[in-house]
């Protein structure tokens, strides 16, 4: 429930008819598959598939957009991973790390946090701008690849070494 996958489905409800060539693939939905499938059926959505937990690499290779609508995360590695494949992240701004990872409108989309709760219609408008504009989506994908390099193993390793040296010097 923490991942709030139903929010992605509600957002897709606004998009499916406008983008008939696109599909929503839900990966790693937890133990809530029956409820989520029921929700998809109740909304009459046709272009949704549930893949369960599998290695994300194959999905990153064929995806254009990844949506993460959790209420909270620590540092979601899935964002750095997907960005390294040129997948544009769309993230609900409900936790502090979002701004550290994504520059809204440049290398991803940040759905604004709303005190009244998640607004699927607002999210859909933001996602539609990326879905409907190949040039924008490709530019964001390239920027995402560049940003992801900040989170590479080599980059992180070098930062840890620098931190350890600073601690040792003190």
Language model features with spans:
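C-terminal alpha-helical cap of glycosyltransferases
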Residues: 153-170
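Nucleotide-activated donor-binding/catalytic signature segment of Leloir-type glycosyltransferases, i.e.
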Residues: 35-53
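Aromatic "clamp/platform" in nucleotide-sugar-dependent glycosyltransferases that forms part
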Residues: 71
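Short hydrophobic beta-strand element within catalytic cores of glycosyltransferases
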Residues: 88-92, 97, 102
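Short alpha-helical donor nucleotide-sugar binding micro-motif in glycosyltransferases
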Residues: 53-54, 59-63, 160
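A conserved mid-protein helix/loop that constitutes part of the nucleotide-sugar donor-binding site
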Residues: 1-14, 31-37
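A short, well-ordered alpha-helix in the C-terminal region of glycosyltransferases
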Residues: 129, 136-150, 162
